[in-house]
A protein has these predicted regions:
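Single, function-defining residue in the core of a domain
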Residues: 2-167
Length: 167
């Protein structure tokens, strides 16, 4: 390129007001400079009553566990490398069920003490819905959420919540 410096940035944006609540900037390259590391530096901004609506890049066991530890809830698109099987788990409705994720091995960046405080399993809700737009291919979207109460948070409400992140 032209030699201009480049950086990574992660922002927490309020869904209600579209205001940037907080942001983290970091170098483009180097250890602990990825977007997940930047988001980890902002986790203290989440608390009771907050719902983190996130891209699939952040939909990991460790990130969800960290947000739950701060009493925040999660609504995120499932990472494309995770397999979904709606025949397993506890069925709540068509393409709506509870699943259990097991804690993965300790990442290099995490110390042993922190790792041992993380729960061995997470009970999550997985839903799938379809986006139909005239003149376009129908697209399936799979969401992972910690909003487990299917009577309080129906499937369509979760799909709508995730869809709002694009507005």
């Amino acid at each position: 390129g032209c030699g201009f410096p480049i950086a990574r940035a992660v922002a927490i944006v309020s869904l209600a007001t579209a205001c940037v609540m907080d942001a983290a900037l970091g170098p483009y390259q180097g250890k602990e400079t990825g977007e997940t590391a930047l988001l980890r530096s902002l986790l203290s901004r989440f608390g009771k009553g907050d719902i983190a609506v996130m891209d699939r890049y952040y939909c990991s066991f460790m990130m969800i566990a960290a947000l739950l530890a701060n009493n925040a809830q999660v609504c995120a698109r499932k990472h494309h490398l995770r397999h979904s099987d709606f025949r397993r788990g506890i069925r709540l409705g068509k393409y709506d069920h509870w699943i259990m994720w097991k804690r993965p091995q300790r990442p290099e960046w995490m110390d042993e003490e922190t790792y041992l405080r993380i729960p061995e399993t997470l009970i999550l809700r997985e839903i799938r819905y379809w986006i139909v737009e005239k003149g376009r291919r129908t697209k399936s979207v799979t969401i992972i959420t910690t909003l487990l109460d299917h009577r309080k948070y129906d499937k369509q409400s979760i799909a709508d919540l995730y869809g709002f992140r694009w507005n």
